Amino acid sequence: MFGLKRNAVIGLNLYCGGAGLGAGSGGATRPGGRLLATEKEASARREIGGGEAGAVIGGSAGASPPSTLTPDSRRVARPPPIGAEVPDVTATPARLLFFAPTRRAAPLEEMEAPAADAIMSPEEELDGYEPEPLGKRPAVLPLLELVGESGNNTSTDGSLPSTPPPAEEEEDELYRQSLEIISRYLREQATGAKDTKPMGRSGATSRKALETLRRVGDGVQRNHETAFQGMLRKLDIKNEDDVKSLSRVMIHVFSDGVTNWGRIVTLISFGAFVAKHLKTINQESCIEPLAESITDVLVRTKRDWLVKQRGWDGFVEFFHVEDLEGGIRNVLLAFAGVAGVGAGLAYLIR
């Protein structure tokens, strides 16, 4: 009987973490050792056969662990000791494990400190690196330095790959209206048919200006066809590059500082004469660049004068016939000087 009691006491003491656990215990008394005083009574009740394991503590089977248990005694419930019929209720109720069995959850106060250290600002979180002291953080590169670093991937024209092409200069109403009138007149002269499409925003004014240009321009070409042919022969216009070179001759027309409607209408009339030539050599695609060159010379260099004359409204109201003839002579002289027209042209415009 005593041997059985002794085995039960040793088994219970070992499972409860009492003395005699082995090396490293140092002989220290564990909380489970406090039950030694009741070992004989518990063993006696087991031998009788009617006692519940819960009576060992002096309470019911569902009683909670004694309040005297220290935090170090909190352990997972173990199987019943040798000779016991029910689980050992003296062990602390099992706690849910959120980690692997080999790991132990850190206390709450130990977990709060790393969590506080891990808090980063949105910028640091996006950058993907741990926060550093201000003295060690790299300085933010200026915008100009970032642009300079990407300069290694520039295109052949020196612009950045992501740089959009510069926006074209917005064409004002005077330029748009002038280009529409001159371009339509040159196309009509090349094809020999009137364009019946409606004009742009300044429809009424543009339509009247185009009608006036047809009447005056056609007369200039008839009266000075020989001179125009001589100048065209000297200029030897065959392609778009030759058309672009006409800008130099057009600018020379106004080199003396005199501007009037006679010179302007003669310049446009000669452009129509060139457009007919481009049609005959199958270079109709050059007619539009020719119209743009004439418009550029007139609007870009003579804008102030055109504005003072009220633009194409002033052209429609132009009635000074003598000014028209005087302008024609000056234009022919200018073309003769640049294109090298011979004595026949000089006699014509004397």
UniProtKB/Swiss-Prot annotation:
Biased region (Gly residues) positions are 50-61
Positions occupied by motif BH3: 209-223
InterPro entries in the cross-refs: Apop_reg_Mc1, Bcl-2-like_sf, Bcl-2_BH1-3, Bcl-2_fam, Bcl2-like, Bcl2_BH1_motif_CS, Bcl2_BH2_motif_CS, Bcl2_BH3_motif_CS
Polar residues: compositionally biased ranges: 150-161
Q: Which UniProt keywords apply?
A: Apoptosis, Cytoplasm, Developmental protein, Differentiation, Isopeptide bond, Membrane, Mitochondrion, Nucleus, Phosphoprotein, Transmembrane, Transmembrane helix, Ubl conjugation
Q: Mutating K5R has which effect? A: Reduced ubiquitination
Region annotation (PEST-like) ranges: 104-175
| Topology versus the membrane | Single-pass membrane protein
Q: Where is this motif: BH2?
A: 304-319
| Residue(s) at site: Cleavage | D127, G128, D157, G158
Which residue numbers mark the cross-link Glycyl lysine isopeptide (Lys-Gly) (interchain with G-Cter in ubiquitin) in this sequence? K5, K40, K136, K194, K197
Where's it found, cell-wise? Membrane; Cytoplasm; Mitochondrion; Nucleus, Nucleoplasm
* Inducing stimuli: Expression increases early during phorbol ester-induced differentiation along the monocyte/macrophage pathway in myeloid leukemia cell line ML-1. Rapidly up-regulated by CSF2 in ML-1 cells. Up-regulated by heat shock-induced differentiation. Expression increases early during retinoic acid-induced differentiation.
Region of interest: Disordered: 47-87, 148-171
Residues found modified as Phosphothreonine: T163
A single GO CC term, please?
membrane
Function as written in the Swiss-Prot or TrEMBL entry? Involved in the regulation of apoptosis versus cell survival, and in the maintenance of viability but not of proliferation. Mediates its effects by interactions with a number of other regulators of apoptosis. Isoform 1 inhibits apoptosis. Isoform 2 promotes apoptosis.
The record's note on quaternary structure and interaction partners says: Interacts with HIF3A (via C-terminus domain). Interacts with BAD, BOK, BIK and BMF. Interacts with PMAIP1. Interacts with BBC3. Isoform 1 interacts with BAX, BAK1 and TPT1. Heterodimer of isoform 1 and isoform 2. Homodimers of isoform 1 or isoform 2 are not detected. Isoform 2 does not interact with pro-apoptotic BCL2-related proteins. Interacts with RTL10/BOP. Interacts with BCL2L11; may sequester BCL2L11 to prevent its pro-apoptotic activity. Interacts with GIMAP5 and HSPA8/HSC70; the interaction between HSPA8 and MCL1 is impaired in the absence of GIMAP5.
Name of the protein in its database record = Induced myeloid leukemia cell differentiation protein Mcl-1
Species name for this entry? Homo sapiens
Q: Source taxonomy lineage?
A: Eukaryota, Metazoa, Chordata, Craniata, Vertebrata
